[in-house]
Amino acid sequence: MIIDLHTHSNASDGTDSPSQLIANAIDAGIDILALTDHDTIAGWQEAEAALVSHPKGASLKLVLGSEISCQDRDGTSIHMLGLLFDPNFEPLMQEMEKTRENRLTRMERIVARLNESGIEITMAEVYSQKRDDATLGRPHLADALVARGHIANRDEAFATYLHNGSKFYINHYSPSPIDAIRLIKAAGGVSIIAHPLASRSGRKVEPEIFTELIEAGLDGIEVNHRDNAEDEKSLLLEIARQHNLVVTGSSDYHGTGKMNRLAEFTTSPEEWERLESRARERRVISK
């Protein structure tokens, strides 16, 4: 059984539409797929409709969720995957909306910094790289820089201008990971910290933070991810085992926006069963 619990569509910063993502997952032989766009559930309805209408849709089960942007006390970026939560739980929906709104003002400030350094780009060009209801993010700015000819591709844009240590980087409002976990749990869902050490992408949290996250109700750790180095995977696996947390592996697929391939890392059926059992209700979508 092939289980991929972390993917993105163009409802945030992926390049596949939710329908295309479903079709690609079916073609890839995936059995269980989670759609986890950044701070939004905008792609849920289309993904579910695509699954039901696809002639081979019975081969795939769909897990709906979101990757929620968070920051710890030191401003370190932490991403929390929320799965199987109730989309009608207003406190969680309001928090994600607040984060999305703040992304707009943040993007305006990043664009201004680029312009001040002689890198010409406009907000209109950034907006042209996303669909109307998509969550605005740095990948859209990266695509605009590529289209303008400033850079060759998304990866180069992040390596040169948009990484967290860049002089152009600006934090945006987002909840603490503890608050995000509590909201996900209150909405009946399960929470997984995404690529938590991720030294290969420049994002790294201190292992000590796990104590607070576990106390808040953390359900799992995304251990197997291309941005976690091998020694980091070993450390994360040890933490998960010590605290009886679910171990997941995921692609973090973004379509053509990143090198990540669907199901390049996966979650075992046994760990998925443990994770799903922690949700308040069964919310997996099937044809």
Tell where the protein language model's regions lie, with residue ranges:
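Extended substrate/RNA-proximal surfaces in nucleic-acid metabolism proteins
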Residues: 50-211, 266-286
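An N-terminally biased module of ancient metal coordination in phosphate/nucleic-acid-related enzymes
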Residues: 1-77, 162-163, 175-258, 267, ...
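A short acidic, helix-capping loop that chelates divalent metal ions and anchors anionic groups
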Residues: 91, 258-259
